[in-house]
Amino acid sequence: MRVLENCEPKRVFYYFEEICKIPHGSGNTKQISDYLVDFAKKHGFDYVQDEMNNVVIYKPASKGYENAPTVILQGHMDMVCEKRPGVEHDFEKDGLNLSVRDGYISANGTTLGGDDGIAVAYALALLDDESIPHP
C-alpha cells in the first residue's frame, strides 16, 4: 500500500511519493534527474538533460493547440536536507519516510522537501494526463 494513495489529486501524490523515494538533496540530483529522463523516455517525450542534471521535458501540443503560446511548468528537483537530532537518515542514500496524520503529509524525522517536490509532481502528473488539452 502506498502511503499517499488516499491523497488527492491521486496522480500528483503518486508522483510526489515516487520523488520522495529518491535521494535528492542539494548537490545530489543525478538520481532524480535520471528519473525524469526515464519518465520522458517512457512517454515518448523529447527531453534535454544537461551536465548539471537539469532536465527539460517537451510535450507535443494537443490537436488544435499547435499554434498557441508555449507553457512552461518549472520547479526545482533538490531539497534542503535536515533531520531531527538522534534521527538516523542518510540523505545521500535513503528516500524519505512519509506519513499522513490529520490530513497533513510529513516526513518522519526529516524535512519533507515538499516546496518544489510538489511542483515537479504536478508537472509530471500534467505531462502524464492525456485528457487536458494543452499548447
Please identify what each model-predicted range represents.
Residues Y65-P135:
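Active-site metal-coordination/substrate-binding segment of hydrolases
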Residues I22-H24, K59, G75, G109:
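Short glycine-centered, acidic/aromatic-flanked micro-motifs in structured strand/loop junctions
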Residues V3-C7, H24-G27, T110-G114:
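Alpha-helix capping and helix-loop boundary segments enriched in small/acidic/polar residues
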